[in-house]
């Protein structure tokens, strides 16, 4: 309440892939009613509370988000109307016709997913072309810091490993192995420190693009909620942006930038272009309320050796609380010794 943070409060039900359908057994409903009434009376006086939900990822028999047709959810909706009528209630999250982003227009209401980088190309078309109204859970996995890896394992590793090849690694991050992803994107990494840097860069890239894409649909997309900020277990790799021992990953800083009140963004659909290819990408500046006026917007294309291959600075008038299209980033992809360039926006 004091910090002004909005709270989405779910009743204590979650599928997590097990028992997806909310129970309608009479004894369970009796216990759930008692728990829900207590929760409503305790929490309804908090000004930070904005919405109630029946629970996390609750499904029907067809694996679609549960609706008020379920007796369990209908009972909770009635209790909210009776005890906290000023607040919104949703049956579950995700809610609506689809649980995940749909390619069919108009069906992505409150959606979840995904939690891993979808690959060069698909990551950007999947998240960049959605029409979701609310993206209430998504993530991207990345390795923990070197300090956390060394502290978690009895012997500090010098080389990365696949989770499936090492029981201890698997115990600390089975779902979140990024080994093949990094090998595909960057080639083989022998050194654990380099591997961690690559893994954290990919996590940061994946999350930043999703956040910027959703914000470029301002007034059509109402929010983005990352899974997750921190974690209750010392994983070697996970979707958290702050690891178990409190070390910020690169994604922490890139997501912070993406939420900045004044933020330039580039809209693209892949990370690789052949040398000599003409590249033309939309450039937008995202603004919060209260931020408006003329601003200098600059971009540059540089090599890792510091060479500048293209650049431009322009003055643009920025409207407040808006997606300000300020032109394009247009250049011919240069031939570089290492095949890499950096596009910088300011």
State where each predicted segment sits.
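Short secondary-structure boundary/capping segments
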Residues: 4, 66-69, 104-108, 149-153, ...
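Substrate-binding clefts and catalytic carboxylate motifs of secreted carbohydrate-active enzymes
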Residues: 52, 81, 90, 118-318
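Short glycine-/acidic-enriched loop or helix-start segments at secondary-structure transitions
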Residues: 63-64, 101, 145, 236
């Amino acid at each position: 309440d004091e910090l002004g943070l909005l709270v989405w409060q779910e009743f204590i039900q979650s599928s997590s892939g097990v028992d997806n359908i909310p129970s309608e057994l009479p004894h369970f409903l009796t216990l759930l009613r008692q728990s829900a009434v207590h929760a409503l009376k305790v929490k309804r006086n908090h000004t930070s509370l904005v919405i109630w939900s029946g629970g996390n990822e609750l499904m029907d028999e067809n694996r679609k988000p549960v609706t008020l047709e379920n007796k369990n959810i209908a009972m909770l909706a009635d209790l909210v109307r009776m005890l906290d009528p000023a607040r919104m209630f949703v049956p579950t999250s995700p809610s609506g016709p689809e649980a995940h982003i749909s390619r069919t227009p108009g069906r992505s209401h409150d959606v979840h997913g995904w939690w891993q980088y979808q690959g060069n190309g698909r990551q950007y078309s999947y998240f960049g072309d959605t029409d979701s109204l609310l993206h209430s859970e998504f993530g991207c996995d990345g390795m923990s810091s070197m300090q956390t890896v060394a502290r978690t394992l009895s012997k500090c590793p010098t080389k990365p490993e696949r989770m499936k090849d090492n029981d201890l690694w698997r115990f600390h991050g089975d779902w979140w192995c990024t080994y093949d992803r990094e090998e595909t994107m960057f080639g083989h990494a022998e050194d654990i420190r380099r591997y961690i840097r690559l893994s954290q860069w990919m996590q940061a890239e994946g999350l930043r693009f999703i956040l910027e894409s959703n914000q470029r649909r301002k007034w059509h997309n109402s929010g983005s909620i990352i899974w997750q900020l921190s974690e209750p277990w010392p994983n070697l790799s996970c979707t958290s942006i702050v690891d178990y021992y409190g070390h910020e990953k690169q994604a922490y800083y890139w997501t912070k930038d993406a939420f900045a009140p004044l933020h330039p963004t580039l809209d693209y659909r892949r990370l690789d272009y052949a040398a000599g290819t003409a590249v033309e990408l939309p450039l937008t500046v995202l603004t919060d309320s209260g931020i408006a006026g003329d601003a200098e917007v600059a971009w540059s294309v540089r090599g890792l050796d510091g060479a500048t291959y293209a650049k431009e600075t322009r003055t643009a008038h920025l409207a407040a609380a808006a997606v300000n299209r300020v032109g394009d980033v247009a250049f011919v992809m240069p031939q570089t010794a290492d095949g890499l360039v950096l596009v910088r926006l300011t």
